[in-house]
Regions:
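Conserved acidic residues
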Residues: 52, 203, 335, 362, ...
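Short, surface-exposed amphipathic charged segments that create phosphate/polyanion-binding patches used
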Residues: 150-154, 287-295, 415, 465-475
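Generic long, charged, amphipathic alpha-helical segments
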Residues: 387-418
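Short, compositionally biased "basic patch" segments
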Residues: 191-206, 293-300, 370-396
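Hard-cation-handling environments
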Residues: 229-374, 387, 422, 437-439, ...
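A general structural motif
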Residues: 185, 218-223, 314-324, 343-345, ...
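A polyampholytic, Gly/Pro-enriched intrinsically disordered region
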Residues: 100-105, 292-305, 469-495
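His/Asp/Glu-rich metal-coordinating catalytic cores
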Residues: 1-55, 60, 64, 69-252, ...
Length: 535
């Protein structure tokens, strides 16, 4: 059997691995690269028509976003995923295709004036529909034979509704080898969904490492913090605008807001309106409601047993059409607006920012990771003005973050997951982490007695009776990056701050061996500065 690592190696998006075993070829995930890209993904080394199938760990676009392109290029195999993942991919791949078509149309309108050659979308809605027809839903904890000598099982990994680790049994020459692909390992105690299931045996493991170098810290009081933000904003007469990822995070926030209203934690504002202004989020919320209750955690199942919808609350309103979206800003009552995209790079959220950023009574609340170079990152780094739809907008609203919300396990969560295997796997392949994070986490596992490595894109490993042997090293072709257009002054200022911090570290190193009295005074001055600015 052979593993070829094609994407999300020494980076966190574009997950794709080719498994060739028992006479079959299967991709595990086929994701789109998003945000900052470090290394070029490698092309799939076989024609799409020669691939027998795909196993999708979950619905996020960085794990499934190239499935329509695969279908466009004559892939006709089955795509296996859990039933909730099949449902979520149905809406997310269509949405991704609409974005591809819109961006191509916009570039062509712009390019026509300059005589540029027309561009084609990466894929179309028709391609997405073709891919969606290839999906087959699989129940959790149910073994399925894909072909003689190839058996799979999906196990809940607690990252997103429908997310899974995938166990694969390969039988060749009378010997059975078990592989486990972790998928994205979930954080503990997330609302709605179950905690990750720990598997206990495998010969080889392919494991994510997103937060393999850090800890999340103590779990914040999300409901209390959110209630305080709502209270002070509504008391000022303002709106709370929340850029939110349509699938997963929006439903978590609805869960929190339902509890806030149920307990009366916001005083004096009755059943304040809560708008979901994202067609994708509205569809995702419907899928959450229609999903088998067994997919949810114990607390959510208890609510459902009492006839309580865990993501429904009085005052909840949905805006499907563009006209309905525009009408939200005509409503002067203090309200919550949940809209996509979560990093403010596209979608209806940009219109809500235009109408609310300049108002000091309003709050913009970020509830997820903001990648470098995005409008969301620019705002949380302290921009005083931004440009939206060609218009300069002064930032006068309160900018807040609800920290600690994460769908990914931290370092301790990852270690708990891998340490559940007994005996230890023969080798652990580290994927889905930033460049240095993968190296750090591989070393952490090595220090704990595992045999671990972090392959680069294009690496090939042959697994047989003699063990796992690397037959081709991955390539380290770095992607050239251009600075994003319209970057805010705040990004430049923040880089000055980062440079100053690096200089401080160099000065500290230069003082090694100095007099204790001087070093103590230096440390006191640094701590005083940190105390002043640590907010």
């Amino acid at each position: 059997m052979k593993l070829t690592f094609l994407g999300a190696n020494h980076e966190v998006t574009g997950s794709c691995t080719l498994l060739e075993a028992a006479g079959q070829r299967y991709l595990i995930d086929c994701g789109m690269e998003q945000g900052k890209d470090t290394y070029e993904n490698q092309p799939i080394p076989v024609a799409p028509g020669e691939i027998d199938g795909v196993l999708a760990t979950h619905a996020h676009i960085d794990h499934t976003g190239l499935l329509p392109l695969l279908a466009r290029n004559e892939f006709r195999g089955r795509i296996y995923a859990t039933n909730p993942t099949v449902e979520l991919c149905g809406i997310m791949l269509r949405d991704s295709a609409h974005i591809q078509e819109f961006e191509a149309e916009w570039k062509n309108r712009k390019g026509k004036r300059s005589g540029a050659e027309p561009v084609e979308p990466m894929y179309t809605v028709q391609d997405a529909e073709a891919a969606i027809k290839l999906f087959r839903g699989v129940d959790y904890n149910t073994k399925l034979e894909l072909a003689p000598g190839l058996v799979i099982e999906f196990v809940d990994v607690g990252h997103l509704l429908g997310s899974a680790s995938i166990a694969i049994w390969v039988t060749e020459n009378g010997t059975t080898t078990k592989l486990v692909f972790s998928g994205d390992i979930g954080n503990q105690n997330q609302p709605l969904i179950k905690d990750p299931t720990y598997l206990t045996d495998a010969d080889y493991v392919v494991m994510e490492s997103t937060y393999g170098d850090r800890l999340h810290g103590p779990r914040p009081d999300y409901i209390g913090e959110l209630a305080r933000i709502l209270q002070r904003t509504f008391d000022r007469g303002g709106n709370v605008v929340i850029p939110s990822f349509a699938v997963g995070r929006t439903q978590e926030l609805l869960y929190f807001i339902r509890e806030i209203k149920e307990k009366g934690l916001v005083k004096g504002h009755g059943n304040f309106p809560v708008y979901i202004d994202s067609p994708l989020a509205i569809e995702a919320t419907r899928i959450f409601r229609d999903t088998d209750p067994d997919c949810f955690d114990e607390a959510t199942r208890a609510l459902l047993a009492q006839g309580i919808d865990p993501i429904q609350c009085p005052g909840l309103r949905v805006s499907v059409t563009s006209d309905e979206s525009r009408m939200i800003n005509a409503d002067r009552e203090p309200k919550v607006i949940l809209s996509a995209s979560g990093m403010c790079e596209a979608g209806r959220i940009r219109h809500h920012l235009k109408h609310n950023l300049w108002r000091p009574e309003c709050t913009i609340l970020f509830v997820g990771y903001q990648a470098v170079g995005t409008l969301g990152r620019t705002l949380i780094e302290g921009a005083t003005d931004v440009k939206l739809f060609g218009e300069a907008i002064e930032v006068r609203a309160e900018i807040c973050q609800l920290t600690g919300l994460s769908g990914h396990a931290d370092k301790n969560g990852l270690l708990a997951w891998i340490n559940a295997f007994s005996p230890k796997p023969k080798r652990v392949f580290i994927v889905h982490g930033d460049d240095e994070v993968e190296n750090i986490f591989a070393q952490t596992l090595t220090d704990e007695g595992f045999t671990a490595c972090a392959p680069y894109n294009g690496a090939q490993w042959v697994i047989g009776a003699e063990g796992a042997v690397c037959v081709q090293e991955g390539t380290r072709v770095r992607v050239e990056h251009r600075p994003s257009e319209g970057a805010s002054r705040a990004a430049t200022v923040f880089q000055r701050l980062v440079s100053a911090g690096k200089r401080l570290l160099r000065v500290i190193e230069h003082n090694e061996g100095g007099a204790n009295k001087d070093l103590a005074r230096f440390a006191d001055q640094i701590n005083a500065l940190c105390d002043k600015w640590d907010r």
